[in-house]
Amino acid sequence: MKVWLKRRLTGLCYGYLRSQHDWAHDKSPKVRHARVLPMASHAPWVNDAAFLKVYETVRHATLVDIMRLYELWTLARQLDNVEGDFLEVGVWRGGSGCLLAMAGQREGRSVFLADTFTGVVKAGAHDTSYSGGEHGDTGVDLVLEMAKRCRVADNVRVLVGMFPENNAEQVSDRLALLHIDVDVYESARDVLLWAAPRLVRGAVVVFDDYGFFGCEGVTRMVNEFVTQNSGYRFLHNLNGHAVLIKVADHGE
């Protein structure tokens, strides 16, 4: 197919999809959705051989797409000079957590992976699609095996149970990166409020579910937190992530 024809057809398709009206979930009318179709096409992971090698190892053990995994990878790779450990809450089968462990190059850094291993918990009135128990098709053994395959078993610590209620005392009190992938309002809020005073300056918080239909509870929680806490820079990425960067301690 000729280049001009490809461009013409692409433009027509994009134009049609973008012309569709925005929409919202019936249970969360203030969180609006639309066809997010940026024209940008740069795919930096294509030339990142180190990332692609890791991606091929972990991709079958995660529900996170390559765009979000690459963002986690690049963020983690920039934190070698930031003191603190990594924490992921909402692990599923360990793919994204082990990717973080492989990305982090700081000597002595631990990666804590917390999950109930029984599926989503704390679904409530703020949530639109989740009722509890979803994504329960996992197990501790699957995560431990993934850590062995990735050769990060010495750095990874798996925490079983509801976080922070059942296992937070096992996590260090200084965190450089927090990845929250829990799908619902209350669980995301509880994790963030527990972690906030433990985040060092320069730490990064990534919310996996912020931009997705069906996860409006997480969207609402993040928006509320940002308006109430001035010590963070907030980025809404069109890949679905929300990213917070801690720039000041409480009260500064």
Residue ranges and their predicted role:
Residues M1-T57, V247:
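Membrane-proximal basic amphipathic "stem/tether" segments
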Residues P38-L63, W73, V82-E252:
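S-adenosylmethionine/decaboxylated-SAM
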Residues M67-E71:
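N-terminal pre-P-loop "Q-motif" helix
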